[in-house]
Regions:
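Terminal domain-initiation and capping elements
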Residues: 2-459
């Protein structure tokens, strides 16, 4: 199997971060069920008891009774996350008891060792230390204070009081339990420092990310990102089509701003917002840019949108050429020439690729300037989850783009008509389609009709 590229690896890790029950009620119900299993299984096997109802109910009562204490130590008092923590922690507790039962059969022991139940409780507590510090925003001291409350309460109501001291002072428990607790503490301490000096606290970043995803609140993460952001001057190019009576107009927009970093942070929906700013009569294309040009906050997004009102016209015209398309191996460049302004579309379709590198843009723009073009607008029509573009493909795209520009210089220009339609009123609510919708531009040039299709679906 070929090694995955970096983009795919990040996508996999992002997907793993979203593994959670769909509802905290599901987590609560599952936690209660698992706690009941722990009580019944431990009582019947490890303790050899025939009375299962009392230990089962006692463990469930301890779980529910201590559950509300967790939110007191969580940074945002989020009950749902606390319930998710209990579900995974109780699962570890139960797995440990099952391992002990399996070990008895595997090693042909005469009886079950309570070590595995006690160890399950300690592993549960260790897990809680890690989660409370990273996800729930507790300090190490608070995490230690709360870590043992739920697992220890469940343990004490399950295990007879005359067995407490012997089970908890077992040398192996002290050794392995101390190791787990030490690892959890060290892991929490070191991971929080992993982002320094650029990042004050890695845990704050994780908590802000979780908040943005679970509560759709971008503010904490935007505040962190803004601290490391820098000012830059960007341009936004527009190709405006207007009817002779000026009653209808339509625009092809190429912002240097790149959509991102991800929903709902910063300019993640910049395409849809520009579309609305243009009265829903625009195609907002992907220019040659990358995630270095993400807007970090909603405030910067609004500043950018307001700046669009300051647009100035560089050139006016009423003619264009018929489209030209040039293919070099996997690379394809297509374009039209509007008077002296070229519109280029670069693609490796149907092959995927990541964002085109800036040098492709600068080299094409320099080539166009040398050929006396007024301006060249370059659209990056890449597939979002493709691999980083190779040197060979990049060179082929440059050759195809230059050949297209040279050919456009020789093409005859014609007056043209345009028509535009989008899905604004079609109620297309699909996960793959963002707020910029789907649109089609029709150009009638030299008595021939050409269509340009577009969807706000890249990121």
């Amino acid at each position: 199997m070929p090694e995955k590229d970096d983009v795919s690896k990040i996508h996999d890790k992002y997907t793993l971060s979203l593994i959670n029950p769909s509802s905290h009620y599901i987590s609560l119900a599952a936690s209660i069920a698992i706690a009941g299993l722990i009580g019944a299984f431990t009582a019947s096997t490890y303790l050899g008891s025939t009375e299962l109802i009392f230990p089962t109910l006692a463990v469930i009562a301890a779980l529910v009774g201590t559950q509300f204490l967790d939110i007191l130590f969580a940074k945002h008092r989020e009950y749902s996350k606390s319930l998710h923590v209990s579900l995974f922690g109780n699962s570890l507790f139960f797995v440990s008891t099952l391992i002990g039962f399996g070990a008895m059969g595997l090693f042909e022991k005469d009886g079950l060792d309570l070590f595995y139940v006690t160890m399950g409780m300690v592993v549960f507590a260790s897990f809680r230390i890690g989660i409370f510090t990273t996800i729930l925003g507790a300090s190490l001291k608070k995490a230690w204070a709360v870590a043992f409350i739920q697992p220890m309460a469940m343990y004490l109501v399950l295990i007879p009081s005359d067995m407490w001291i012997s089970s908890l002072t077992n040398p192996w428990i002290i050794l392995f339990g101390g190791a787990f607790l030490g690892l959890a503490t060290a892991w929490s301490y070191l991971t929080d420092k992993a982002g320094r000096p650029g990042l004050r606290s890695t845990h704050e970043l994780i908590q802000a990310y979780v908040t943005s995803m679970s509560r759709k609140d971008p503010v904490p993460l935007e505040e962190i990102i803004e601290k490391s952001s820098t000012e830059s001057t960007v341009s936004t190019s527009q190709l405006k089509f207007q009817s002779s009576d000026k009653d209808n107009d339509f625009r092809i927009v190429l912002p240097d701003i790149h959509p991102g970093p991800f929903h709902p942070i910063g300019g993640s929906n910049i395409t849809g917002l520009i579309y609305k700013e243009m009265d829903s009569t625009a195609m907002v294309m992907h220019s040659i840019s990358n995630h270095d040009l993400n807007l970090p906050t909603q405030k910067e997004v609004q500043n950018y949108l307001q700046s669009l009102q300051e647009s100035k016209s560089k050139q006016n015209g009423a003619v264009c050429t018929e489209p030209v398309s040039v293919t070099m191996n996997k690379a394809r460049a297509s374009g039209l020439l509007f008077d002296r302004t070229a519109l280029l579309f670069l693609s490796l379709s149907p092959h995927g690729m990541e964002d085109l590198p800036p040098n492709v843009r600068s080299e094409i723009e320099q080539f166009a300037e040398n050929r006396n073009f007024e301006q060249v607008l370059i659209v990056d029509t890449h597939n979002a989850m493709g691999k980083e573009i190779s040197k060979e493909d990049s060179e082929d795209l440059l050759l195809a783009a230059k050949s297209t520009l040279d050919t456009l210089k020789t093409k005859e220009s014609h007056s043209f008509k345009f028509g535009f339609a989008n899905s604004e009123k079609m109620n297309l609510n699909q996960n793959d389609i963002a707020e910029g919708r789907i649109a089609t531009l029709c150009l009638e040039i030299n008595n021939k009709k050409y269509f340009l299709g577009w969807a706000d679906a890249n990121n």
